[in-house]
Each structure stands twice: as C-alpha cells, then as structure tokens.
Amino acid sequence: MSAVEQHIPNDQFLQKLTAFYRDSKIRGPKSVYVTMKPYDGRTKAMPKGSTFKEGDEISCIFRAKWGSKKIATEVKAKEVNKFHTQYSAIIVAQMVNLEKRKKTDDEKKKTGATKA
C-alpha cells in the first residue's frame, strides 16, 4: 500500500482475508494479523488527548496483514452488524488452523499440583 491507504470494499476484504487464512495454512508465514480501530476519515493522527465528537460519523477500519501483503477496509456504523457476522463466520471456519500450545515443564507441574 502507498502512504495514503487504499480501502477496498467490505466483501472484497472478507474474500482476501479468507485467502490469507487459506494460504497461511498451505504456505508462507503462519500468522495473519487483523486489527480494528475507530476511524473518522482522517489521514493524519489526532492530537494526544483529543476524542471523537458526538456529531461525527464514526466508522471502524479493519486492517489485515499476512507476510508482506496488507489489506484494509472501512466499515460504516450502519454496516457493522452485517460485517461482524460475516467476519465471525470466517474466524470460526479458520479455527481448525490453530495449533495446540505445548506446555512447559513448569506449567505441567502447576496444573498437576492444583488437581490434587
């Protein structure tokens, strides 16, 4: 992406996010990073201590990164529920990719002591 971030449509973002998860399972880096922040259309940072005004139309910006590939979309307040439902479905479908974390010896001792 360039210095000014280009936002893609929500449906296209979800399709590319699904492709990121699928590709991360097959090849390349395993981690897909997704962030969500409030967004009011500014391209420059807000001064410290300032907040959104009540009259402002607040939306959310979703960003995803997999390896060197980055995508972003702006979700308007009216579309949040629809987007969140679709996003949740993608996350649930991709949970099969999660790997169980291996416990260290210290963690095994702690859990064994609490069970007794």
Curated annotation (Swiss-Prot):
- Please indicate which superkingdom the organism of origin belongs to: Eukaryota
Instruction: Name the principal localization, coarsely classed.
Output: cytoplasm
Question: Where in the chain are disulfide-linked cysteines found?
Answer: none
- Molecular function as annotated in GO: 7S RNA binding; endoplasmic reticulum signal peptide binding
Q: Where in the cell is it found?
A: Cytoplasm
Q: Name one Pfam family in it.
A: SRP14
Family annotation (InterPro entries) = Signal_recog_particle_SRP14, Signal_recog_particle_SRP9/14
Q: Which GO terms describe its cellular component?
A: signal recognition particle, endoplasmic reticulum targeting
Q: Does the keyword Chaperone apply?
A: no
A Gene Ontology biological process noted in the UniProt record is:
SRP-dependent cotranslational protein targeting to membrane
What are the entry keywords? Cytoplasm, Ribonucleoprotein, RNA-binding, Signal recognition particle
Please verify whether the record's keywords include Iron. no
Task: Return the similarity comment.
Answer: Belongs to the SRP14 family.
Subunit note: Heterodimer with ZK512.4/SRP9; binds RNA as heterodimer. Component of a signal recognition particle (SRP) complex that consists of a 7SL RNA molecule of 300 nucleotides and six protein subunits: srpa-72, srpa-68, SRP54, F37F2.2/SRP19, F25G6.8/SRP14 and ZK512.4/SRP9.
Q: What PANTHER family is this protein classified in? A: SIGNAL RECOGNITION PARTICLE 14 KD PROTEIN
Function description = Component of the signal recognition particle (SRP) complex, a ribonucleoprotein complex that mediates the cotranslational targeting of secretory and membrane proteins to the endoplasmic reticulum (ER). F37F2.2/srpa-19 together with F25G6.8/srpa-14 and the Alu portion of the SRP RNA, constitutes the elongation arrest domain of SRP. The complex of F37F2.2/srpa-19 and F25G6.8/srpa-14 is required for SRP RNA binding.
Q: What is this protein called?
A: Signal recognition particle 14 kDa protein
Name its species.
Caenorhabditis elegans
